[in-house]
């Protein structure tokens, strides 16, 4: 394995173990066993390195989508939505990084392609489900973006404790079920 890949692997491990704020170039270099200047020989800066890590997160999320059961379109979409929330809850630091435009370079070609692939796959799943919204003639990519935003918000609120402390004490599964019922009818 080359130094560039080792730096990405090490940054991913630090991210998972210690969170976004702990992932510094110097800390990555130390944990990877390379000189403190090595990251800048392989990346233009922290944003480029973190973009490579976030790209890996999108690839992992896409891999989950490719493993969806071969069932009805509605069941596949429901499984994809559960997979998204499960990914967020199982990988909170990666989930945070993937959407932190202050830490990553959203114009990075690999990151942009990976994020687009995840959304495009999701949009295809949404378009395949005959819902009242779809029958109304709504732009299905906009519907997909709206459902994604709802899923993302649900996951983020759960991670931040915004729903966990609610007086009615929902579980992620029950909140997701209500969200899906609202979108899918």
Stretch-by-stretch model annotation:
Residues 6, 10, 14-48, 52:
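Helix-turn-helix
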Residues 10-17, 60-68, 150-157:
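Solvent-exposed, amphipathic alpha-helical segments
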Residues 15, 50-57, 98, 114:
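Alpha-helical DNA-contacting segments of helix-turn-helix folds
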Residues 52, 66-94, 119, 137-147:
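Hydrophobic alpha-helical connector segments
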Residues 89-106, 156-164:
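Amphipathic alpha-helical segments used for helix-helix packing
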Residues 106-133, 141-146, 170-181:
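Amphipathic alpha-helical packing segments from all-alpha helical-bundle domains
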Residues 128, 148-166, 181-185:
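Amphipathic C-terminal alpha-helical segment
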